[in-house]
């Protein structure tokens, strides 16, 4: 007959079962809804930086760890910290390639998996929230903007926005584009209170789409507009090309 005492884990499980205690609740691991780390390159002004996007039910702090160790720590403080944070989007400074070459920017973070994890706020049961971001150094080339032509004055009406397909990286290697993002904004000061820009639109389209017509209802007569096409490759890295036009 085995008379040795139960191992600590087994003993804890027995006590938890006897008392009806939900021991697993304190050790819950809640997957992040979103865990992304990408590169954004601007092919028009030639600068490059990193971006991240995180979404969860609620976290009290986060640590981002990659192949070379910790690259970022986030810790909310103050009155709102007790509520916990959910969504977060961040961008690094994007130095000009002439000052910091792309190769030097890529050397900051190696390719690979980046673990994003931290505590779940107590009000949501505690535990840990975690996810993994995938970073590559595949940077798409910029799309060629076709219409409207740069600096064109277009009639007020339905307007065709078109661009060339992107098939290579900035180093000439084949690239898999998974989407294009079209952004159009009326040039002007941002609203002092509204999050987001008034008189603007943003949409993602399939990689097979290189042309879309925007309704005349979006545009105002005699107004300047800026537009961008972002080519997004399969790991999430994106390159933007931008232009300007105006309406009659």
What is each model feature region?
Residues 12-21:
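Bacterial N-terminal signal peptides
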Residues 44-50, 157-161:
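Structural beta-strand segments of beta-rich domains
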Residues 69-100, 177-220, 234:
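Recognizes extended acidic, P/S/T-rich segments that occur
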Residues 105-111, 217-223:
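Surface-exposed, short loops/turns at beta-strand junctions within beta-sandwich domains
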Residues 118-120, 229-231:
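Conserved structural position at the C-terminal beta-strand
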Residues 127-129, 232-248:
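Extracellular fibronectin type III
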Residues 130-144:
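Proline/serine/threonine-rich low-complexity linkers at boundaries of modular beta-sandwich domains
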Residues 154-174:
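Conserved aromatic anchor
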């Amino acid at each position: 007959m085995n008379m040795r005492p139960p191992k600590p884990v087994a003993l804890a499980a027995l006590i938890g079962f006897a008392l009806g205690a939900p021991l697993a609740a304190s050790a819950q691991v809640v997957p992040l809804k979103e865990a992304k780390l990408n590169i954004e390159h601007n092919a028009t002004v030639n600068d490059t930086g990193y971006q991240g996007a995180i979404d969860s039910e609620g976290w009290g702090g986060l640590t981002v760890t990659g192949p070379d160790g910790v690259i970022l720590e986030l810790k909310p403080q103050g009155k709102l910290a007790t509520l916990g944070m959910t969504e977060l989007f961040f961008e690094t400074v994007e130095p000009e390639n002439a000052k910091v070459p792309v190769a030097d920017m890529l050397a900051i973070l190696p390719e690979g998996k980046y673990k994003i994890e931290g505590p779940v706020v107590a009000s949501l049961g505690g535990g840990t929230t975690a996810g993994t971001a995938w970073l590559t150094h595949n940077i798409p080339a910029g799309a060629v903007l076709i219409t409207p032509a740069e600096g064109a004055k277009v009639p007020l009406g339905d307007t065709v926005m078109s661009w060339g397909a992107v098939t290579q990286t900035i180093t000439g290697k084949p690239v898999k584009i998974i989407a294009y993002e079209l952004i159009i904004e009326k040039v002007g000061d941002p609203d002092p209170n509204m999050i987001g820009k008034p008189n603007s639109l943003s949409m993602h389209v399939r990689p097979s789409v290189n042309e879309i017509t925007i309704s005349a209802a979006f545009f105002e007569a005699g107004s300047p507009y800026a537009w961008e096409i972002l080519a997004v490759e399969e790991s999430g890295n994106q390159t933007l090309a931008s232009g300007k036009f105006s309406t009659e």
